[in-house]
UniProtKB/Swiss-Prot annotation:
Function: The RuvA-RuvB-RuvC complex processes Holliday junction (HJ) DNA during genetic recombination and DNA repair. Endonuclease that resolves HJ intermediates. Cleaves cruciform DNA by making single-stranded nicks across the HJ at symmetrical positions within the homologous arms, yielding a 5'-phosphate and a 3'-hydroxyl group; requires a central core of homology in the junction. The consensus cleavage sequence is 5'-(A/T)TT(C/G)-3'. Cleavage occurs on the 3'-side of the TT dinucleotide at the point of strand exchange.
Listed name of the protein: Crossover junction endodeoxyribonuclease RuvC
Family: Belongs to the RuvC family.
UniProt-recorded Gene Ontology molecular function terms: crossover junction DNA endonuclease activity; DNA binding; magnesium ion binding
Binding locations of Mg(2+) 2: 67
Length: 173
């Protein structure tokens, strides 16, 4: 059993999603958004760090996955997003969690089946895959998508390792 924390970073809203892997299946544990005040950027970055640290303390994840920076419409937005990512990553590293990063295309491909999926499609598939009774907010759904992408990627790597080592289904004979 392992717990994965997925993060969809932002300088205003950072989504988080937590899943537990039991017997090769993902179970929903929690999700939500860290909303920062409208203050100066350094203060907002501290709020992201503190929020992610609280989530780590609450859920005690074994692994941490985060969305990579994409090229935003302007350089200032991309820099702020990168700094918010850095704040979240530092919280994970301080908690001694392994950090994995995925592009938006990889996440959409893993969750929806196409790298060009719309946010609504990600929300729908996250709701379906985790058997949720209600659709999560877009940022929380994206973060759950990050966690699911990490889980699926890890499963593929385990299967590939099993084939190359002579093991069966990721286990040695």
């Amino acid at each position: 059993m392992s717990i994965i924390l997925g993060i969809d970073p932002g300088s205003r809203i950072t989504g988080y999603g937590v899943i537990r892997i039991v017997a090769g299946k993902a179970e929903y544990l929690g999700s939500g958004c860290i909303r920062t005040d409208l203050g100066e950027l350094p203060s907002r970055l501290k709020q992201v760090y503190d929020g992610v640290s609280e989530i780590i303390t609450q859920f005690k994840p074994d692994e941490f996955a985060i969305e990579r920076v994409f090229m935003a419409r302007n350089a200032d937005s991309a820099l702020k997003l990168g700094q918010a990512r850095g704040s979240a990553i530092v919280a994970a590293v301080n908690a001694l969690l392994p950090v994995s990063e995925y592009s938006a295309t990889q996440i959409k491909q893993a969750v929806v089946g196409t790298g060009g999926a719309a946010k609504e499609q990600v929300q729908h598939m996250v709701t379906h895959l985790l058997k949720l009774s209600a659709t999560p907010q877009a940022d929380a759904a994206d973060a759950l998508g990050v966690a699911l992408c990490h889980f699926h990627t890890r499963q593929i790597l385990i299967k590939m390792a099993g084939r190359s080592t002579g093991s069966v289904r990721g286990r040695y004979r």
